[in-house]
Amino acid sequence: MDSFLPILNAIDSFLWGVPLITLLVGTGILLTIRLSLIQVVHLPRALGLILRAKNKGAGDISSFKALCVALAATIGTGNIVGVATAVKVGGPGAIFWMWMAAFFGMATKYAEGLLAVKYRTTDEHGEIAGGPMYYIRRGMGEKYRPLAGFFAVATVLVAFFGIGTFPQVNAIVDSVELSFGVSRVVTDIALTVLIAAITIGGLRSIAEVAARIIPFMAVLYIVICVGIILMHIGEIPAALALILDSAFTGTAAAGGFAGSTVMMAMQNGIARGVFSNESGLGSAPIAAAAAKTKEPAEQGLISMTGTFIDTIIICSMTGLVLVLTGAWHGDTAGAAMTGAAFTSLYGSIGGMLLTVSLALFAFTTILGWNYYGERAVLYLAGVRAILPYRLVFIALIACGAFLKLEAIWVLADIVNGLMAIPNLIALIALSGIVVHETRHYLEKVRRGAWMRR
């Protein structure tokens, strides 16, 4: 398969170049305008709903747990390795464009969450089933059934061969071996047993674990980064100025940094931002559909906070640490670059802290994508296919530490991009429904506030 690598790389570069990025950002801009800057005006309400949502109505898990499952899949190696790669190639200006992708992506994520709840249904066991394949088919009509099926097939392929397995497994075993000297085989066996024990229990088991790990790992990583930022607090204005200046003028070569143009900063920042927060890819609404709620718009608001937490907070922390410590123009790249920034304050312990963060991020990503793939299999083949899917997924985790097939990873990137296309078509086609539901919900909120006066 590696003989096809040049062809696959060319397709990957084209797909994740101007066409898809334009469609992703364009959809976010369209929804931002039609929803009257919902990600700004109603962000405080959205953040408040995370912990005080009513959790009444149809659904399998609470709104908070649904958000944690989505964040489990979203917060991954991209928050560490992806940001470092974007800054290494595109310069500090890539961070600004990452923010822009997240800003417009919040409106996209809101629409995904709303539609997921509005068009969800129940499976043969009475459990909730929802996501893009359902709002494409039920919202756009039966004639778009092939588009829904295409999305579901792409989701299964990404869960099996892309984000959900090999890259995450390799990130865990590599980092644990490097920092703690634990054999890859031992780590892989332990990881496989853990994943099997959790995923065999289905959504409720995954949601329970995610609800415990996600807050802990997010706070841990933020605290580590804040420690470094505080040590350079006087340099923050200069760092922000560098980020803004580089976003519009490019960055000259410095040290191990080869220099970048405005287009390089824009393309890498937006692409890595989208990879990290998954706004528009259609993955998060699969989890959102399972939330206990009567209000589609309310779950949309909660879903929107996922992009805010993932990119505006966590990715920004990584980016600021890289710029403030000067690690971005060193000779390292990827996780090693972030590791250099961590060790600048914490010494050798910094490398261990990074390993723990990376392992937790990758572990929860596996859990989240296991669920996404399972829901896609359910749509394609029904309940009878779920157990075989889980067994294959666990087998791939067991093999993941020993497979380094670059062509498969590039193919997974391509399929990941192809996931987004039917989802974005649906978001644009159903944007009128999103606007109508939003106005109806906000009117009820205003009436409720008026009646309480």
Question: Language-model segments: which ranges?
Answer:
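N-terminal alpha-helical transmembrane segments of multi-pass membrane transport
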Residues: 1-77, 87-94, 105, 398, ...
